[in-house]
Swiss-Prot record:
One of its GO terms (biological process) is response to hydrogen peroxide. Keywords: Iron, Iron-sulfur, Metal-binding, Nickel. InterPro entries: HCP/CODH, Prismane-like_a/b-sand, Prismane-like_sf. One of its GO terms (molecular function) is hydroxylamine reductase activity. This is Putative acetyl-CoA decarbonylase/synthase complex subunit alpha-like. Pfam families: Prismane. Part of the ACDS complex that catalyzes the reversible cleavage of acetyl-CoA, allowing autotrophic growth from CO(2). The alpha-epsilon subcomponent functions as a carbon monoxide dehydrogenase. It comes from Methanopyrus kandleri (strain AV19 / DSM 6324 / JCM 9639 / NBRC 100938). Belongs to the Ni-containing carbon monoxide dehydrogenase family. The gene is cdhA2.
Length: 632
């Protein structure tokens, strides 16, 4: 029995019984992790969803599960594509950065470290099996907390697929690396037949140009994808972020567009028609009812595309690009040449968080000299959408936070300039890091796990709950997901991140205040077994109304029960200064964040003491070994 969903085929086969030789590759099921989900739900208000009645709220929760499953299905499809390409090349797995534990999500869930395509295949088989289980839960009636558990499980599985997809292109890509800010854009595109690759295909540009041979040199191969690299002749030239695809397609500057199974939806066909471009959809593309010319000879497929159809489907990606290139040569002289959007992006060099980087960053994060790590994720669809996430990044960078940006936002930030014409990358080269493709979001979660491996000697193989508990109570990081609308990939990732113990801030939503129910999180001191009041982080997932609230909330959610007095002082000082800058007063919740006198920053001692006296604050004990697990 099996199901197919967005290019993912999930088969339910035989069960692996205990003692089987393959059992060591079996990852945890949702039911095995349900106690952890219930622990999180008992401490944090995760299952808070809008609705006037219980029935309406449950329907919203069910929709969230559906989005998480759709997002995870797409991520698995992407991972399968790149793993198959890895298998075809025969290359050994090389994640592209120096780390003793390069794929920590895989190692935590599956209990081993992958070394080749077959190992990655085993990880995807597990992901597909658990996705099937999550989909089947949609047929059952759950409580809000039950749907929350299913959504988090689907999201966590999606992050595993992300990690696999992120590791593989590092082996396959051959792009020019840069140690400095570099510029991409459309300003100097030559006027010749143009093929625009939209999605993941630009990452494999060197394979495409090699396969197409002289044909590749007769056309201009340009791309919209979720990362960028300096231009080179034998690769696809990136001209903008994937999230802005509608703006680029509708401009009509490309003669033919090739779209794969990345983020774009069915509106790509309409956008291409609006621009007068032909379109070729390939594996995973979310389009329907196109003529499938996969089995046609190339010449016949080109003829059909040029003379009969506006858009066709080709299953094999390289063949799809070949058909597009020949078609571009045919149609280029028969259509009005249009100008591309005039866009330029000065992008910071993609940075991998190696063990060396984590060691250098880990100590100041623990000490509070770096008050926290904030991962900022957004999918700006047009230039105006960049301003708010850029402002969030800017105010956090000014206060010393380490800000990591993956995917389309990492590219789009290259268009946000100050009065002197400088980008944030040029102003904050050491603390604003472009981490690469959007799939690197999983690598960012993995970096939090590797902090525990490097500094806490944390055993991770098969230890999901122990790892998530460590991250939640000791690693001062949070994620901000920003935008008017979220793709299903982003929804899936947001719920998966929560499962790993990393707080997520969502926004903007003008109705945000009505969605928050306050709790008073407590932790257990494993040394004494006593329950200790320490609402840091105060939320694991929350919705905010505007960019200022997002920045403030992120600063607060980077505090942890394990903070040393010096570390908490520095975090409180950064939080107070940021709050004052944005709102002109002291934050009203300092009584929740200051455990005793040693947490009060020296430079703010008198005024904070005065505020604490007004609130009736009394010192609290601190947990020397914080955990949410009763057994410690």
């Amino acid at each position: 029995m099996g199901i197919e969903w967005e290019g993912v085929k999930v088969e339910i086969g035989e069960l692996v019984v205990e003692g089987d030789s393959e059992s060591e590759m079996e990852g945890p099921t949702r039911r095995e992790l349900l106690p952890w989900d219930r622990t999180l739900a008992s401490v944090y208000d995760l299952a808070v969803v809008p609705g006037d009645s219980e029935e309406e709220r449950r329907e919203v929760a069910r929709t969230i599960v559906t989005l998480c499953c759709e997002g995870t299905a797409g991520l698995i499809s992407t991972a399968r594509l790149v793993v198959e390409l890895l298998r075809q090349t025969g290359e050994n797995l090389d994640p592209g950065f120096d780390a003793e534990t390069p794929l920590p999500l895989y190692e935590t869930l599956l209990g081993s470290s992958p070394e080749c395509a077959d190992d990655l295949e085993a990880g995807l088989s597990y992901a597909e099996r658990e996705l099937t289980s999550s989909v089947s839960e949609l047929l059952r009636s759950h409580s809000l907390k039950g749907y929350e558990s299913v959504a988090m499980h689907a999201g966590a599985i999606g992050l595993l697929a992300m990690e696999i997809a992120d590791a593989t292109p590092s082996t396959l890509m051959e792009v020019t690396e840069s140690e400095e800010v570099f510029e991409i854009g459309t300003d100097d595109l030559p006027r010749r037949p143009t093929v625009l690759l939209v999605g993941h295909l630009p990452l494999l540009g060197h394979i495409i140009t090699e396969e197409l041979g002289t044909l590749a040199r007769q056309v201009e191969l340009v791309g919209l994808t979720h990362t960028a690299w300096p231009n080179r002749e034998d690769h696809v030239r990136v001209v903008g972020p994937l999230s802005m695809y509608h703006e680029y397609l509708s401009s009509g500057f490309a003669d033919v567009v090739v779209v794969d199974g990345a983020c774009p939806g069915e509106d790509v066909i309409e956008a291409a028609r609006e621009g007068g471009s032909k379109l070729v959809a390939t594996v995973g593309a979310r389009v329907a009812d196109l003529l499938d010319v996969t089995d046609y000879p190339v010449e016949e497929a080109v003829e059909v595309l040029v003379t009969e159809e506006d858009a066709v489907y080709v299953e094999e990606p390289i063949k799809a690009v070949e058909i597009a290139a020949w078609a571009a040569l045919r149609v280029e002289g028969s259509r009005d040449r249009r100008e591309p959007p005039r866009r330029a992006f000065r992008v910071g060099p993609p940075t991998r968080l190696t063990d060396v980087v984590i060691r250098n960053v880990g100590v100041p994060v623990v000490a509070g000299n770096i008050p926290g790590i904030v991962v900022l994720v957004s999918c700006p669809e047009k230039s105006a959408d960049v301003e708010e996430p850029a402002k969030i990044a800017e105010v956090l960078l000014e206060r010393g936070y380490l800000v990591l940006v993956p995917g389309c936002l990492a590219v789009a930030l290259g268009s946000y300039l100050d009065d002197d014409g400088k980008t944030l990358y040029e102003r904050y080269p050491d603390t604003l890091l472009n981490t690469g493709p959007c799939t690197s979001a999983a690598h960012l979660v993995g970096a939090c796990i590797r902090v525990g491996v490097i500094f806490g000697k944390l055993p991770i193989r098969g230890e999901f709950v122990r790892v998530a508990d460590y991250v939640l109570n000791r690693v001062g990081a949070c994620v901000i997901a920003w935008g008017g609308e979220y793709s299903e990939h982003l929804v899936s990732a947001a719920y998966g991140v929560t499962r790993w113990g990393i707080p997520v801030v969502l926004g903007p939503d003008p109705e945000a205040g009505s969605l928050l129910v306050e709790k008073n999180p407590k932790v257990i001191d494993a040394c004494s077994g006593e329950e200790v009041e320490d609402p840091t982080p105060e939320h694991l997932r929350c919705v905010v109304s505007d960019w200022k609230e997002a920045a403030i909330t992120a600063a607060r959610l980077c505090m942890r029960p394990n903070d040393t007095p010096e570390g908490r002082q520095n975090k409180v000082e950064s939080y107070v200064e940021l709050y004052r800058e944005l709102y002109g007063e002291l934050p009203p919740d300092l009584d929740l964040l200051i455990r005793d006198e040693s947490d009060i920053p020296v430079t703010l001692r008198s005024e904070i003491r005065e505020l604490l006296e007004e609130t009736g604050w009394t010192p609290r004990s601190r947990a020397s070994d914080p955990t949410l697990l009763p057994e410690g």
